């Protein structure tokens, strides 16, 4: 799976991941992270996971 990886608040890259999923993590609507896999979330964080290429933009 090809996922967006968040390097900083304004910079990201695309990466081919071994995992079959990507995630986007947010707090109150603000995106705080993107990456490979599907980590569990701890409130107030929310995680959206997906399985297609570049789906976590």
UniProtKB/Swiss-Prot annotation:
A GO CC term attached to the entry: extracellular region
SUPFAM superfamilies according to UniProt: Snake toxin-like
Cell compartment(s), UniProt: Secreted
GO molecular function term, any single one: toxin activity
Major location category of this protein: secreted
Tissue expression: Expressed by the venom gland.
Database matches in Gene3D superfamilies: CD59
Intrachain disulfide bonds: 3-22, 17-36, 38-49, 50-55
Domain of life per record: Eukaryota
Assigned protein family: Belongs to the three-finger toxin family. Short-chain subfamily.
Function: When tested on muscarinic GPCR, specifically antagonizes the type 2 receptor (CHRM2) subtype (Ki/Kd=120-399 nM). Ex vivo, it reverses the M2R-agonist-induced relaxation in rat and human arteries.
Entry protein name: Dendroaspis polylepis MT9
């Amino acid at each position: 799976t090809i996922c967006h990886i968040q390097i900083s608040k304004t910079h990201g890259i695309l990466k081919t991941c071994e995992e079959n999923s990507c995630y986007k993590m947010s707090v109150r609507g603000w995106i705080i992270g993107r990456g490979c896999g599907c980590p569990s979330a701890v409130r107030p964080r929310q995680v959206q996971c997906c399985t297609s290429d570049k789906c976590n933009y």
